[in-house]
Amino acid sequence: EMKMHIYAFGSICRGEVDWGSDVDLLACVDGPAPQIDPEKYSLYRYERLQALWGEGNPFAWHLHLESKLLFSSDGSDFLGDLGVPARYTAGDSDCAKFKLLFDNSYEAIRQSTNSSTFHLSCMFLAVRNFATCHSLSLGSPIFSRTSPLLVSPRLDIDPVAFSILTRARLLSTRGYGENIMQDEIATAIKEVTAVPQWMQTLRSYQ
């Protein structure tokens, strides 16, 4: 019989529940698992998770801090038994990567609004992950969707614009929500001009 552990993780474990939030599920397996729907589960092999723990990967920290065991084939708590992940040391390179994603998406949306929802979604991902990786590098990780507003200094952005970015993310990843209108795209583009300076300032607080 196949060894398997199932965990819930993410927003539901933070109590961040709203119409757009999904239940994130992790399935840990020791071999091929064709019966598990990859649309519904993040599927990881045990050795891959052990490797992520060993390198102090942000996803390992996320699971360590915000997951709940739902099912265990052998009564053990696999993630719990892995203990505390290694120290996160990739803050600089990860933040540089997300800054680049932001810059590229911002350029793309200014040139053409064809795939604007996708570009806004990437900008949201970049800003959120930048803040999360920064907070993790300081040793007090914030995995919330609103992490850019919870770090110090926070991103000074109009709440309406931030909600447009969040909606774009939900539309792109879950196909959920109201389509984003031209005037909303314009609002978002105008408001995110503050992002590059914020990113630079945030990383100087180390």
Describe the predicted segments one by one.
Residues E1-K3, C13-W19, C28-Q206:
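Catalytic core of pol beta-like nucleotidyltransferases
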Residues V23-L25:
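A structural signal for short, well-ordered beta-strand segments
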